[in-house]
Amino acid sequence: MSRYRGPRLRIIRRLQNLPGLTNKLVESKKNKVSGSDQSIQKKVSQYGIRLEAKQRLRFNYGLTERQLLNYVRIARCAKGSTGQILLQLLEMRLDNILFRLGFVPTIPSARQLINHRHILVNNRIVDVPSFHCKPKDIITIGAPKTYQSILSKRIESFAKDQIPEHLTLSLSEPKKPKGFVNYLINRESIGLKINELLVVEYYSRKA
């Protein structure tokens, strides 16, 4: 299954707000159901609940079905909680790190910057959005000056208290912002509200 490129509002109306996909907020279809309609709503099966959790994770981080399945398999082979390791793997992707630092408004925007070779990790160009960031990595923008100026204004308007503790944003040089990875993210700092165990259960027969 390929990466979704259709209308984003359609997705968040169905799956509720996904910060990585879009910064627009809408009321989900579930909340719009009138009192008379509630009595005729179909009861959601356990499979349906797990499927929705999986879809929320996939669309928020902009993954294909195959990519997410591969991450689940990696998480299953690692020591510790499979669900938490899965979230950690997704959160430490370069495209998500750029988003959490406030460099860009969404993960798709981050992916575009990376694909255009505008992002450096430890002074080396990285053009792979799925690049796994590690503690002590330093992330900078190598874009043209005009583009850098736009990005620096975006970062200045981004509230620093929104940046999770495992990351640090340095604005000592306003036109050359730097992001630092302090350590691997913990569960409390995950930006998406989700029950990761439902995703693990969904893939229990596939991974």
Curated annotation (Swiss-Prot):
Cellular localisation: Plastid, Chloroplast
Top-level taxon of origin: Eukaryota
Keyword match RNA-binding: yes
GO MF, one annotated term: rRNA binding
Functional description taken from the UniProt entry: One of the primary rRNA binding proteins, it binds directly to 16S rRNA where it nucleates assembly of the body of the 30S subunit. With S5 and S12 plays an important role in translational accuracy.
NCBIfam families on file: PRK05327.1, rpsD_bact
Annotated family: Belongs to the universal ribosomal protein uS4 family.
Name of protein: Small ribosomal subunit protein uS4c
Lineage: Eukaryota, Viridiplantae, Streptophyta, Embryophyta, Tracheophyta
